[in-house]
Amino acid sequence: MKELFLFSDMIMHSHTFNYLFHLILVAIIVLIVAKLATRSMQLVPRGSQNLLEAYLEGIVSMGRDVMGSDELARKYLPLVATIGLIVLTSNVIGIIPGFEAPSSSLNLTLCLALSVFLYYNFEGIRTQGIIKYFAHFMGPNKILAPLMFPIEIVSHLSRIVSLSFRLFGNIKGDDLFLMVVLSLAPWVAPLPAFALLTFMALLQTFIFMILTYVYLAGAVVVSEEH
């Protein structure tokens, strides 16, 4: 199957360069969006400010439902909102002909997953203390602690794999699907395909953000039974 045209290939035909080119492009787009939305802040939001505020309020609402606290939801809002913008932009840019989704590379998804993993564990240790935090890994029954502890460790480590490979696999699959559609019917068929891929881009962004909140909640929200 013939490879699709990429604008980055006009500069240098290299997989590594293509990835870095689109990753930098995503970073620039996110910075521009943030700058435009905060350039002239108004009491009654309009235009891009209104759109960004709606996005942030939606994330806070989601975080409040997951963490059970408006304070905690807002505390971790910058992290989740930034990840959301990066993931969404990375997903959507791959739908545009001539561009490739950085999230279709395991390099980006693994870095994001590792960042979330390290941060929620850091927050859990900072909030509860290292002994109390890892004591939760042993479960409520001390007799089963030697069995539960390694299981919990593996379970937490598997989150890196699930977060990174879920996003990578779905977006990579979307790219291959789009390539096939464009090869078979380049003028008519892509229209519904673009709508489907846009929905999938939004869905994968939502899943990544809500799982980030879920992992943070598990780390910092102390259960009474412990």
From Swiss-Prot:
Matching entries from PROSITE patterns are given as: ATPASE_A (PS00449)
Q: What's a GO cellular component annotated to this UniProt protein?
A: proton-transporting ATP synthase complex
Q: Which residues cross the membrane?
A: 17-37, 79-99, 105-125, 168-188, 200-222
User: What topology in the membrane does the UniProt record assign?
Assistant: Multi-pass membrane protein
Keywords carried by this UniProt record = ATP synthesis, Cell inner membrane, Cell membrane, CF(0), Hydrogen ion transport, Ion transport, Membrane, Transmembrane, Transmembrane helix, Transport
Please list the coiled coil stretches: none
Looking at the keywords, is Transmembrane present? yes
Chief localization class?
Answer: membrane
Name where it's found. Cell inner membrane
Q: Mention one GO biological process in which this protein takes part, according to its record.
A: proton motive force-driven plasma membrane ATP synthesis
Please give the superkingdom of this protein's source. Bacteria
Gene Ontology MF annotations: proton-transporting ATP synthase activity, rotational mechanism
Xref: SUPFAM superfamilies: F1F0 ATP synthase subunit A (SSF81336)
The cross-references to NCBIfam families, in alphabetical order and at most eight, read: ATP_synt_6_or_A, PRK05815.2-3
Q: How does it assemble?
A: F-type ATPases have 2 components, CF(1) - the catalytic core - and CF(0) - the membrane proton channel. CF(1) has five subunits: alpha(3), beta(3), gamma(1), delta(1), epsilon(1). CF(0) has three main subunits: a(1), b(2) and c(9-12). The alpha and beta chains form an alternating ring which encloses part of the gamma chain. CF(1) is attached to CF(0) by a central stalk formed by the gamma and epsilon chains, while a peripheral stalk is formed by the delta and b chains.
Main role? Key component of the proton channel; it plays a direct role in the translocation of protons across the membrane.
User: HAMAP family, per this entry?
Assistant: ATP_synth_a_bact
UniProt lists the family membership as follows: Belongs to the ATPase A chain family.
The record's section on PANTHER family has:
ATP SYNTHASE SUBUNIT A, CHLOROPLASTIC
Protein name per the record: ATP synthase subunit a
Question: Which species is listed as the source?
Answer: Campylobacter fetus subsp. fetus (strain 82-40)
Q: What is the lineage of its organism?
A: Bacteria, Pseudomonadati, Campylobacterota, Epsilonproteobacteria, Campylobacterales
Name the gene that codes for it. Answer: atpB
